Amino acid sequence: MLVPPINLHAWVEQHRHLLKPPVGNKCIQQDGFIIMIVGGPNARTDYHYDEGPEWFFQLEGEMVLKVQDDGTARDIPIRAGEIFLLPPKVPHSPQRAAGSIGLVIERERLPHEQDGLQWYCPQCNHKLYEAMFPLENIETDFPPVFDHFYRSLALRTCTQCGHVHPAPERYAAVEA
């Protein structure tokens, strides 16, 4: 059975209260594609690795898509009304401004594909840690990986330059 059209602006207004930290992400449809609305602000330090492309449409406000491009970190600003198609296998870290709202479309993963979360040293851009996993639920599969990385001082310490990657405030008491 066909799903009726969704009035995107009305959906955002009805669910705006859910588009805030710490999650800020709601899946609105999933059938071949994962269609999400994401609200800001956020302060992600991880990079997401997806074997498929991702499509970004900035509805309100601005965001910066940090990417790892051939070993170099760079920023791609995406403003309200702009779209951007991220090619497959490009590590990226969406940085959303307060009050911003974006639509993100990803294709569902193929059975053999895995998602990844990566962290890079903010001083020298050396890869600190990478976790690959089969993605089953985009809203619940990431937090355990975040916890594992941020709770480990060893994983957050750069083997190249010795810099310690900062952990979000909620992990501040954890230095094991």
Curated annotation (Swiss-Prot):
UniProt binding sites for substrate: E54, R96, E106
Sites where the protein binds Fe cation 2: C121, C124, C158, C161
UniProt key word Phosphoprotein: no
EC numbers for this chain: 1.13.11.6
Cofactor note: Binds 2 Fe(2+) ions per subunit.
Record keyword Oxidoreductase present: yes
Binding site for Fe cation 1: H48, E54, H92
Residues that coordinate or bind O2: R44
InterPro entries linked: 3hydroanth_dOase, RmlC-like_jellyroll, RmlC_Cupin_sf
Catalytic reaction equation(s): 3-hydroxyanthranilate + O2 = (2Z,4Z)-2-amino-3-carboxymuconate 6-semialdehyde
Biological or metabolic pathway of the protein: Cofactor biosynthesis; NAD(+) biosynthesis; quinolinate from L-kynurenine: step 3/3
Requisite cofactors: Fe(2+)
Pfam (any one): 3-HAO
GO biological process: anthranilate metabolic process; L-tryptophan catabolic process; NAD biosynthetic process; quinolinate biosynthetic process
Keywords of this entry: Dioxygenase, Iron, Metal-binding, Oxidoreductase, Pyridine nucleotide biosynthesis
GO molecular function annotation: 3-hydroxyanthranilate 3,4-dioxygenase activity; ferrous iron binding
NCBIfam families: anthran_nbaC, PRK13264.1
Family from the record: Belongs to the 3-HAO family.
PANTHER family documented for this protein: 3-HYDROXYANTHRANILATE 3,4-DIOXYGENASE (PTHR15497:SF1)
Biological role: Catalyzes the oxidative ring opening of 3-hydroxyanthranilate to 2-amino-3-carboxymuconate semialdehyde, which spontaneously cyclizes to quinolinate.
Subunit field text: Homodimer.
Protein name listed in UniProt: 3-hydroxyanthranilate 3,4-dioxygenase
Species of the source: Xanthomonas campestris pv. campestris (strain ATCC 33913 / DSM 3586 / NCPPB 528 / LMG 568 / P 25)
